Amino acid sequence: MQARQPPHDRILDAAMRVFRRHGFRRSSIEQAADEAGLTRQALYHHFPSKEALFCAAIERLYERAVLAETAAAKAAEATDAALSDILIAEIGARLGTLFAALEGSPHLEELFSEHLAQARDPYQTYSARFEAEVAKTVARVCRARRLKLASGVTVEELARCGEMAIHGTKSAYPSMQPADAFLNQLAVMLRMLIAGAMAPQTAPPAKRSQRKVCVSTGDRR
């Protein structure tokens, strides 16, 4: 028998459907309550306002994105993928989780805008976490493979530049749609960024000849 979904999760799932369908401004507590199969008073027992409900839904989405990006990075590492491919997989999984939650909504730009206004604290907290996860991946891969960053480049700076690449790609795709085009362009930027951040690989020294030389005759054997 399938376990019943906890009320908190059921409400947030319903709220995301409502926000995706109507946008933030045209959504209401009543709509979210109806979608969750609750009365308005019952929903208020969990969340005091539409703004609090939206903020909680966004925060849960961010947490799922962290889990997705961490799993994607480790999976890519296990295949011996290049550092650039690992980071592209990691950041792509994070963004893919966010895209999937809002897929099909005609209110994408509004939702992206409102989440910055209504969920400012979670946005700042998770932005730092996202960047920290990328930094941990870079450090872990470089340590395991004995890779070195270019002189003057730190793990933290590379991770920060990776996040800036996301914002840079947004300038061409403000709503990050179509998602495939956005992610492809972001991948190009990340590859170029990472290539420039790595120190040149040092070639191993050439092996010396092992042939013996006979001193007395000069003959080589």
Give the ranges of each region predicted by the language model.
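Helix-loop "lid/cap" segments that line or gate small-molecule binding pockets
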Residues: 72-73, 92-99, 106-116, 193-194
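Alpha-helical DNA-contacting segments of helix-turn-helix folds
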Residues: 55-61, 65
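Helix-turn-helix
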Residues: 10, 14, 18-52, 56
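N-terminal intrinsically disordered/low-complexity leader segments
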Residues: 1-5, 201-221
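Hydrophobic alpha-helical connector segments
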Residues: 56, 70-100, 155-159
